[in-house]
Regions:
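A structural signal for small-residue-enriched, beta-sheet-centric alpha/beta enzyme cores
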Residues: 1-207
Length: 207
């Protein structure tokens, strides 16, 4: 049970597509003992925990990548938090921001929207200490624009998957959230889900 809780904390609880959560969201891990493997030592338990966490993380990432009409898979990695909660709040604010996600869909790196999300996340941060890298390129240093050419940053976010690194430079804690862009097609799909499926059925696109 502890292995499952630990794995969920760093995987399924670290993903978002639109910030919403279903009351039906469930993670089940079942074991019937058929493998004959016994966890008898701390080393055995640790190895199992690491393997389970890896599987959970990969499955969680697939949920994000399979989101309706998403075009980009983005890893938001925050470091330098004074507390774990501080880093978590910053990462989640960026990962759930409609403005940030919309800019990614438009191939706009827009680090200004990222730092704005960090600013309103509810954690105490020092804007003049924040560094932001987008796809490995410096976008912001000390709260102001870095020297990386805008065209290079724009090119960096045109790929299907990239990472945004945000260093708060306040401490040693970090947090990662896996998210997506926000596309017009996603909005169109979700603005009337039942009508969408009725039309798809009428068009012969569903079984």
């Amino acid at each position: 049970e502890l292995c499952v809780q630990s794995g969920v904390k760093s995987s399924f609880n670290c993903i978002t597509i639109d910030g919403d959560m279903s009351t039906n969201d469930t993670v089940l891990v079942m074991a019937n003992g058929a493998s004959g493997v016994k966890l008898e030592t701390p080393e055995d338990i640790y190895a199992f925990q690491q393997a389970l966490a890896h599987v959970m993380l990969e499955l969680a990432k697939h949920i994000v990548q399979d989101g309706e009409r998403v075009t980009k898979f983005v890893t938001v990695h925050v470091t330098g938090g004074r507390t774990e909660d501080e880093a978590k709040k910053a990462a989640e604010a960026v990962a759930k921001s409609s403005l940030v996600k919309s800019s990614w869909n438009g191939n706009d790196p827009n680090w200004g929207r990222i730092i704005h999300a960090v600013g309103y996340c509810g954690a105490k941060v020092d804007e003049e200490k924040i560094d932001i890298d987008i796809a490995g390129l410096a976008a912001c240093r000390g709260g102001v624009q870095a020297d990386t050419p805008s065209d290079d940053l724009r090119q960096a976010v045109q790929v299907p998957a990239f990472q945004v690194d945000i260093n708060l430079n306040r401490g040693e804690f970090s947090h990662t959230v896996y998210t997506t862009d926000l596309s017009p097609e996603y909005v169109d799909f979700n603005r009337c889900e039942y009508e969408y499926w009725n039309q798809a059925k009428a068009d012969g696109l569903t079984c």
